[in-house]
Regions:
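Catalytic active-site module of serine/aspartate enzymes centered on a nucleophile-bearing elbow/loop
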Residues: 297-327
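Conserved acidic catalytic loop of the alpha/beta-hydrolase fold
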Residues: 126, 130-135, 139-181
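The feature captures the conserved acid-bearing segment of alpha/beta-hydrolase catalytic domains
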Residues: 218-283, 288-290
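Gly/Ala-rich beta-loop-alpha elbow adjacent to hydrolase catalytic centers
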Residues: 183-192
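Short, surface-exposed "cap/lid" segments of acyl-processing enzymes
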Residues: 47-50, 54-132
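Conserved alpha/beta-hydrolase fold motif
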Residues: 182-183, 206
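N-terminal cap/lid segment of alpha/beta-hydrolase-fold proteins
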Residues: 2-49
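A conserved short beta-strand
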Residues: 201-218
Length: 327
């Protein structure tokens, strides 16, 4: 790989910064520590920004860098969103990226995310040749696959507790930002549903890219979506005493909220996106499924954030967010 700064890059002028959403202070034999702080990196246009900031929540074992660049070195969705006039806040969920983790305060982590799992999720065997937007190698040792897997870490063993932490940190970020739009990917979708549930009125809309599902799914090696779209408890009106009572009840923070689910044509996640939309609509949301092939955008899998047409896959998301901004 040549030095990136010597390649033909793009000259940009933006404002940027970083801060933390601190974790709870806990006592350990060694002293006082923080439990689960969340790192936040933000960028905004040099001169002003659209009214509502965007909060970008990465998926599964990924990190905030999922939004900032692609495995082949191009700008990711976050810089394209800034170019479109938005202020973006990119988080590293607890235990991922720059948000530190220790089992003494969070609990045990699962196995390190292996190449084989990454291949199955993002670049599976493609005998029919439909997954054209990942033209790179699919074998362990191929450069772009190395770049993608480098960002992936383990998930906490206790999926529900990790989602509670994510929801709390995102809710507190919303306290800082005020009304915002959430943009989530994959397993990060659960954190988005929960954060909106904890701060009704603070989320103007949710763009969920390839959200995990279907409702009440068992996720092998990860956990169970016991409460419909989340492993952690979600508040309903009237109150659901058990997960089985959730379907059809109003979910504060989602009720009345515009939500768009974006799916790629070659992704298995597209197969259950309509079921997620139905679940959300039954909770009072205004949900729609945006299947990219219906817009003429074809060949994308689960990682449509960083596939070769990422500059095109982000455009329907930008267009939808603009409708929320102007509502």
């Amino acid at each position: 790989m040549p030095p990136p700064h010597r390649s033909a890059g793009e000259a940009i002028t933006i404002r940027r910064g970083q801060f933390w959403i601190p974790g709870e202070r806990v006592r350990l034999p060694s002293g006082t520590a923080q439990r689960g702080p969340m790192f936040v990196h933000w960028e905004a246009p040099a001169d002003g920004a659209h009214r509502l900031p965007l909060v970008l929540v990465h998926g599964g074992g990924g990190q905030g860098s999922d939004w900032t660049g692609t495995p082949d070195g191009r700008p990711g969705w976050a810089p394209r969103l800034v170019e479109a006039g938005f202020a973006v806040y990119v988080v590293d969920r607890c235990g991922h990226g720059r948000s530190p983790y220790h089992p003494d305060v969070i609990g045990p982590m699962g196995a390190q995310f292996p190449y084989e799992a990454a291949k199955e999720l993002f670049v599976p065997e493609d005998p029919e040749g439909g997954h054209t937007r990942w033209p790179f190698g699919r074998d362990i040792g191929d450069a772009e696959l190395d770049q993608m897997v480098s960002a992936m870490g383990p998930l906490p063993v206790d999926l529900a507790e990790s989602q509670r932490i994510d929801a709390d940190r995102l809710a507190r970020l919303l306290d800082v930002l005020g009304e915002s739009v959430l943009l989530t990917h994959s397993l990060g979708g659960a954190a988005g549903w929960l954060a909106a549930n904890r701060r009704p009125g603070a989320v103007a809309g949710i763009a969920a890219v390839e959200p995990v599902g279907p409702p009440f799914a068992e996720l092998p090696g990860i956990g169970e979506l016991r409460w419909g779209l989340t492993a952690a408890e979600i508040t309903t009106e009237p109150v659901a005493a058990t997960p089985e009572e959730v379907p059809g009840k109003a979910i504060p923070g989602l009720t009345g909220t515009p939500i768009a689910l974006f799916s790629g044509g070659e992704s298995p996640f597209a197969g259950f996106a309509d079921r997620i939309a139905d679940f959300l609509d039954a909770a009072g949301a205004s949900a729609e499924h945006v299947h990219l092939p219906e817009l003429g955008i074809t060949g994308n899998g689960h990682g449509l954030l960083w596939e070769t047409n990422s500059d095109r896959t982000v455009k329907p998301v930008i267009d939808w967010i603009r409708t929320v901004q102007h509502a």
